[in-house]
């Protein structure tokens, strides 16, 4: 008859110790894998957000200076000083049309008239794009829409000898003193296009809880965000409104290719002043 001998206390302790070591190693491995996966997902989001931001900017910049049928941009008067993109008066908007692309190189305090220093990441560039929407609408439709919305009309003058442009608001469309240009038939008033001013900048937060970004925004963890301030209308008044575009954008630096010889190709890379 064979007797079975149980495990001693020492053997039990050794077994438990080995098990705990294996469990600790497995836990550490799972934790590292989870951390690695989280970092990969974070990197993927950053790459995708950056790609999306570039796509948005690319699409808008391609249309910079598009003013409908009015293609003689070189005939536009160039103001003596750099225009303020925050101004919304029709006269200011019209005088700035020659600057279809306007940039600010790493300003420290944003744009004093519409982008407060607290809402702009210091040292990041600001880009301004001016153009019109490709889609047209009739003067009657513009008159029935928001009164403060700015529109551009391009067409023939009453004499039929000159092609020109007119800039005005939806309120102007209810009369006949501003939008007076014609189609090529000389009798039908030319259609209108929304006039656009887009100001792109990097903000230290995504959703503001107050009038300016603060440490309490975005759940107490402010997310740097690419935002766009756009010419719009509210309550019959022309104004600027801000829209968050892409979260996770911490910096924006822009170089400008300038064609100095008129051959259609950039001859050098420059930064804005």
Would you name each region that the model predicts?
Residues 3-58, 62-64:
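Aliphatic-rich helix starts adjacent to a transmembrane/signal segment
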Residues 53-273:
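N-terminal pilin/flagellin-like segments and related low-complexity appendage regions
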């Amino acid at each position: 008859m064979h007797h079975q001998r149980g495990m001693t206390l020492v053997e039990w302790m050794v077994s438990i110790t080995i098990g705990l070591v294996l469990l600790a190693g497995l836990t550490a491995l799972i934790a590292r894998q989870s951390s690695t996966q989280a970092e990969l997902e974070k990197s993927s989001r950053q790459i995708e957000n950056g790609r999306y931001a570039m796509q948005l900017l690319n699409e808008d910049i391609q249309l910079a200076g598009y003013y409908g049928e009015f293609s003689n941009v070189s005939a536009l008067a160039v103001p003596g000083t750099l225009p303020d993109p925050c101004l919304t008066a029709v006269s200011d908007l019209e005088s700035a049309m020659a600057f279809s692309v306007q940039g600010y190189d790493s300003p420290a305090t944003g744009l004093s008239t519409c982008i407060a220093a607290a809402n702009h990441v210091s040292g990041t560039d600001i880009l301004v794009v001016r153009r019109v929407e490709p889609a047209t609408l009739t003067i009657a439709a513009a008159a029935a829409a928001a009164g403060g919305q700015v529109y551009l009309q391009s067409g023939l003058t009453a004499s039929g000898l000159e092609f020109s442009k007119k800039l005005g608001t939806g309120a102007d469309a209810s009369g006949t003193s501003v939008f007076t240009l014609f189609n090529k038939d000389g009798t039908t008033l030319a259609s209108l296009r929304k006039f656009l001013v887009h100001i792109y900048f990097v903000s230290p937060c995504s959703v503001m809880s107050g009038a300016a970004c603060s440490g309490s925004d975005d759940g107490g963890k402010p997310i740097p965000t690419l935002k766009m301030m756009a010419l719009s209308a509210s309550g019959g008044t022309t104004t600027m409104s801000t829209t968050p575009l892409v979260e996770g954008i911490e910096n924006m630096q822009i170089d400008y290719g300038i064609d100095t010889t008129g051959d259609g190709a950039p001859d050098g890379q420059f930064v804005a002043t």
